[in-house]
Structure formats: structure tokens, C-alpha cells
From Swiss-Prot:
Region annotation (Interaction with PALS1) ranges: 268-466
Gene Ontology terms for molecular function: guanylate kinase activity; signaling receptor binding
Name of protein: 55 kDa erythrocyte membrane protein
Species of provenance: Homo sapiens (Human)
Domain Guanylate kinase-like: 282-451
Superkingdom per UniProt: Eukaryota
Domain SH3 stretches: 158-228
């Protein structure tokens, strides 16, 4: 059974609250004066292909088309790359393929995408390969003179788009990238400002907060998803699964998520569009980790130390109550028929069975905790992350990894293997990763990070706002 999130009224109200917060943030930004950038010293002079430097712009001379040629001169005194890539168009003319945002040429504003280069320092570029021309541009120093025919097409304004990377990328290891030196290296979770996406395969971006101002090439979502899908198709069909959820353990068929797991494996990820919001309170703390990593100890410690702040939602079960159990305290006890009806109505965010009895956590239970202005703690399976990662629940997702200290026993090695399997498939959902070298240390780091997330600007999925 595929798990689905409910679409109740509370979800709509939370969505509106974050939308209003974002709108207020945008209005405040628009009221601030924009910084003015000053271009580098560049000399340009217009002429025409008949050699005339006349100020007019004749369309034809004696029945022949006359194209405007621009002479561009500037001095290159450092080893800094110019920040452009070249290509040959259908007429085998050398044109500017892309200009890297923040690079030397971009700061000058002297060239634009589509400009045709005729000469480099007096040398005609005809009959030269792109590699030869790129090398010439890279190695040239001192005064540089270019003759170009400007591209007359309109130029679009700069983009204002931010994406969270959902995979690690190293351009030096990419055989598809047209220029490895122009690539941008990033890691899962990095926020990338998208500068240009004119090329359907290679976008330009820069990592937010990086000291490097110039942009670099990154694979577009379409290219990355095609790449991953192609690799998956070429992989052996009988490859063994590294998922830790197939082994026998408590709640071995928890959440009936085998179909969800299959779809997770086919769900190719690349980037997630995000927006930056002012500080707001996260309503749910989600703990993710392999079985035996210590999530229960951490959860129980949070509940006992901060009962006024954190609450664990009481689960529902079809198991008969024991003599010492009180309905609504450890469990809500319901019939199998009622629970089956509730599952069909998508009232459970997760559910499963153990020893013939069904267990599950309802959305409504979590909502009731939020209405008390408290934070709900969930220790769920990773397959459920898609369902809880919404504006309605506003989760802060923490991955708990096993200790990397002490003796490497067989059990610890298996735990580390299971943990890595979860990380490799779901890391793009994590807000924080912690190594559990001790409950006290982990608790301190977790609470500090959670408080920091609730009191400072945050990057959230654009779906939380729009």
C-alpha cells in the first residue's frame, strides 16, 4: 500500500503562514538599495565589415549585407581564467558558448553569449579547433585584442533561483562536461544559486556562502536524471540489495512499505528548488537511523529532560490491552476494522504489523501536539520521510549515525553498513547528521542545532511557500 499524506485544513493554514512570511521577507528585500557594480577597464570600438568606422548602422552597402564588428581591448595581468567557453556554430564560426557569472569577461561586460569571434590578437580564428582557441585564450597575457560580431538577440535578466543539491558532484570526474576547469564542485545539501540555465544540459551556478564569487558549470536536472537512469538501466538486474530493511527484526514489515521502497529506488533526485525564509519554529523533530543506533535512548532523554517542549505521539494498535495498560497512555487501542478504515482514509503517517497486530501513528495525533505549541518527536523509517517533509509538519530531520570510536566488532560493522545504506539513499532529506558517540554529547549537539534552526534564517523547499 502506498503511503500518502493527508490534505487537511491544518496543512493549508500552515502553508499560508509560511507564504505570508516569505512575502514579507521579499518586500523587505525590495526596499533595500541595490549594490552598484563597476566594470573593469575595457576599450571597445565599433566598425563594419567593409572597414568603415562610421557611427551610423547601414544595413547594406552596394547590395551587400554589412555586419557590425566590435574591437574589444583589455589587459590580462593575472592567471585568472577569462571565464568563457567557445563553440563552432553551424557555419563553423567561433562563437561564445557561455560566460561564467563572476568571471573576468562577465565583470567586464565586453562579450555576450552568441557573439562571434573573428580575431584574437590579430590572428584569424578560421580553421582552428575549439580546443586550440580555448588554449589560446587561456595562455594569452598582457594586452588582449578581440574582433567580434555582437549577437543582436535580446539578453535576458539574471535569474533569482536557488537549488539544494541532492547529490555530490566533482567536475574532474565527469566525462560529459565540456570543460572540466569550468565546472563547479558541490556536495549534497549545498545551496546553489542558479545564474544561467540557457543551456539545456549545463547550467551555471555558485555555491551560496562560498568565497569563490565566479560561477561554474553544473549538470542540469534533466542531464543528471538521464545520467542516473542510464546507469541504473546498465546495472545488473540481479544486483543484491544493500537495504537494511529486508532483514528480520522487530516490525520487520513495518509500514507495509515494500512498494514505497521500490519507488524510492526509481525516484531519481538531482536538485530541489528552495527559498530562504526568516526564522520560524520547526514543529516536528524527526529522528532517522539504522535499527540499534540509539534513537530510542535519544528520544526518551529528550522527553524526560524537556517534557514541556517535546511530546511523543501516542501510537494506535489493534493489540489487546494488558492489565497494567491504560487506553491513550502507552497506546490507543482500536479494532482491526477501525484501523483498516483509518488506513484507507490516509489518516496514518506510518503503520505496520508485529506478531499479527497492527501499529501506527496518526496525523491527527501529531497535529494535537502542535496545537499545544509543543514539538512532536517522530522516530520513523526513512521511507516515510517523503510524507512528513511538508510545510504542514515543518520537520527538522536528524540522521543518527553509529559511533566511529571503540572496537570494530562484527555487530558494529553491520550497524555501520546499514547506516551507510540509509545515508546513501536518503541523505538529501537530512537537515543534520550526528555521530552517536554518546547520548549526552549527541543530545547537546542536537538541541543546539534545533534551537539554531528555529532562531535563524532557513532554506526550505519552495513547495512549503507556493
Amino acid at each position: 500500500m502506498t503511503l500518502k499524506a493527508s490534505e487537511g485544513e491544518s496543512g493549508g493554514s500552515m502553508h499560508t503562514a509560511l507564504s505570508d512570511l516569505y512575502l514579507e521577507h521579499l518586500l523587505q528585500k525590495r526596499s533595500r538599495p541595490e549594490a552598484v557594480s563597476h566594470p573593469l577597464n575595457t576599450v571597445t570600438e565599433d566598425m563594419y565589415t567593409n572597414g568603415s568606422p562610421a557611427p551610423g548602422s547601414p544595413a547594406q552597402v552596394k547590395g551587400q549585407e554589412v555586419r557590425k564588428v566590435r574591437l574589444i581591448q583589455f589587459e590580462k595581468v593575472t592567471e585568472e581564467p577569462m571565464g568563457i567557453t567557445l563553440k563552432l556554430n553551424e557555419k563553423q564560426s567561433c562563437t561564445v558558448a557561455r560566460i561564467l557569472h563572476g568571471g573576468m569577461i562577465h565583470r567586464q561586460g565586453s562579450l555576450h553569449v552568441g557573439d562571434e569571434i573573428l580575431e584574437i590578437n590579430g590572428t584569424n580564428v578560421t580553421n582552428h579547433s575549439v580546443d586550440q582557441l580555448q588554449k589560446a585564450m587561456k595562455e594569452t597575457k598582457g594586452m588582449i585584442s578581440l574582433k567580434v560580431i555582437p549577437n543582436q538577440q535580446s539578453r535576458l535578466p539574471a535569474l533569482q533561483m536557488f537549488m539544494r543539491a541532492q547529490f555530490d558532484y566533482d567536475p574532474k570526474k565527469d566525462n560529459l562536461i565540456p570543460c572540466k576547469e569550468a565546472g563547479l564542485k558541490f556536495a549534497t545539501g549545498d545551496i546553489i544559486q542558479i545564474i544561467n540555465k540557457d543551456d539545456s544540459n549545463w547550467w551555471q551556478g555558485r555555491v551560496e556562502g562560498s568565497s569563490k564569487e565566479s560561477a561554474g558549470l553544473i549538470p542540469s536536472p534533466e542531464l543528471q536524471e538521464w545520467r542516473v537512469a542510464s546507469m541504473a538501466q546498465s546495472a545488473p538486474s540481479e544486483a543484491p540489495s544493500c537495504s537494511p530493511f529486508g532483514k528480520k527484526k522487530k516490525y520487520k514489515d513495518k509500514y507495509l512499505a515494500k512498494h514505497s521502497s521500490i519507488f524510492d529506488q526509481l525516484d531519481v533526485v538531482s536538485y530541489e528548488e528552495v527559498v530562504r525564509l526568516p526564522a520560524f519554529k520547526r514543529k516536528t523533530l524527526v529522528l532517522i537511523g539504522a535499527s540499534g543506533v540509539g534513537r530510542s535512548h535519544i528520544k526518551n532523554a529528550l522527553l524526560s529532560q524537556n517534557p514541556e517542549k517535546f511530546v511523543y505521539p501516542v501510537p494506535y494498535t489493534t493489540r489487546p490491552p494488558r492489565k497494567s495498560e491504560e487506553d491513550g497512555k502507552e497506546y490507543h487501542f482500536i479494532s482491526t476494522e477501525e484501523m483498516t478504515r483509518n488506513i484507507s482514509a490516509n489518516e496514518f503517517l506510518e503503520f505496520g504489523s508485529y506478531q499479527g497486530n497492527m501499529f501506527g501513528t496518526k496525523f491527527e495525533t501529531v497535529h494535537q501536539i502542535h496545537k499545544q505549541n509543543k514539538i512532536a518527536i517522530l522516530d520513523i523509517e526513512p521511507q516515510t520521510l517523503k510524507i512528513v517533509r511538508t510545510a504542514e509538519l515543518s520537520p527538522f530531520i536528524v540522521f543518527i549515525a553509529p559511533t566511529d570510536q571503540g572496537t570494530q566488532t562484527e555487530a558494529l560493522q553491520q550497524l555501520q553498513k546499514d547506516s551507510e545504506a540509509i545515508r546513501s539513499q536518503y541523505a538529501h532529506y537530512f537537515d543534520l547528521s550526528l555521530v552517536n558517540n554518546g547520548v549526552d554529547e549527541t543530545l547537546k549537539k542536537l538541541q543546539e542545532a534545533f534551537d539554531q534552526a528555529c532562531s535563524s534564517p532557513q532554506w526550505v523547499p519552495v513547495s512549503w511557500v507556493y
